[in-house]
Amino acid sequence: GEAPAGAEADTVKGDALDLPFDDGSFDRVIAAEIFEHLPNDTAAMAELCRVLRPGGIAAVTVPSWLPERLCWALSEEYHTVEGGHVRIYTRAELEAKLKATGFHIGPHHHAHALHAPYWWLKCAVGTDNDTHPAVAAYHRMLVWDILKAPRLTRTAERVLNPLIGKSVVVYLRKPLDRAGDGV
């Protein structure tokens, strides 16, 4: 949703391995599509847990295994670019790492199924080839879908998300105490 009227926010530049916030600074945190880029993902996960207050909720997203694996198979360039993806997670691997850093694992779902074919096209024709007719047409469709949210594409995405959702979303809770029994 949108921020309520009068809400304020600050932009802070930081390092995912050493966040510039005190322990327990946030009630809610989101880590969207970052862990797959970091060689030391577990340190970043621990930092996320550190800045979340006990009882706080986190949402983490990473690329889903199947769509990401297809991108890697279609394009060496997709995953060897500097700063690019250094790993592909299964949901079980991601959840095990998050649990090991102190989180309780909650529900999960897949999202952005209509985005997976777009990335497969880009991987097939070149990740920088935004002018390819198929890539450009698919991009226009995605923008239209985002802006208009027509029933047809919303239904298609809801049906396809469990199969080819580009991202997996995992919800987490930080225990009230480090023993983990206070949630």
What is each stretch, according to the model?
Residues A58, H85, K166-V168:
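A generic secondary-structure signal marking the coil-to-beta-strand transition
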Residues K97-F103:
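A structural motif corresponding to the C-terminal end of an alpha-helix
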Residues E76-E93, H110-H112:
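Acceptor-substrate binding/catalytic loop of class I
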Residues A73, H112-V183:
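A C-terminal cap/extension of S-adenosyl-L-methionine-dependent methyltransferases
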Residues A3, Y78-V81, R154:
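A short, structure-level motif marking secondary-structure boundaries and short turns
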Residues F103-A113:
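Conserved S-adenosyl-L-methionine
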Residues A7, E82, H104:
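Residue-level signal for beta-strand positions within conserved beta-sheet cores that form or flank
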Residues G1-C71, T90-E95, V170-K174:
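Conserved SAM-binding loop
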